[in-house]
Amino acid sequence: QTCALPIGTGGMSDPYIPLEKELGLTRRCLELIDEYGFGLAIQTKSDLILRDLDLLKSIHRKTKCVVQITLTTHDEALCRKLEPHVCTTKRRAEVLDILREEGIPTVCWMTPILPFINDTEENIHGILDYCIHAKTYGILTFGIGVTLRDGDRQYFYRKLDEHFPGMKQKYIQTYGNAYEIPSPSQASLMRLVRKTCAQHGIENNTNRIFAYMNRFEDKLAGEQLSLFDFT
């Protein structure tokens, strides 16, 4: 017996890199996903995804399409420092709003949050407000912090020196060579996230969010299958 299942993309590389405007490879992939009736969970930081709204809606009519958007920095000036090669957080929040209006469910990735830089209540409140307005299904946080592999650490520190003089030394003194870099305010910020999500009906449990995205819905047949049914 064969059946369609959800396809996930965007976890390791953004499917809407600038070159996608010329190549259209992601759009062709979506055309195949739509043609063969697969579900979709796609993650991006780009508003270029709106170019393919027709395909996202077509996929969602047959099964389920979930768009995941990363929001980490509410302040636009800081966003341009931390994420110089993608559209601003405000624009990504507008994408969430448009997707909501078109009936496409969304999930926000509120990660990474950088200690001593954007790990403030003001920043988290701002991102939560965007998610509340867009009626996102869920918010993924993985705690409040960032992870640093050895190869990434050197590049990260160079950027700290460039944009936040003195911050590298603070990271070294606080975290050494640790892989996991939690915010000193992690506990209080996570309480804020959980409380706000509970008040507004937004899912914040990581396992439940991924179970939702992995669960295949055949809207034409009225049946549901999960990836876990085939493991």
Residue ranges and their predicted role:
Residues A4-T174, A178-I181:
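Conserved AdoMet/S-adenosylmethionine-binding subsite of the radical SAM
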Residues Y157-T231:
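C-terminal accessory extensions appended to soluble enzyme cores
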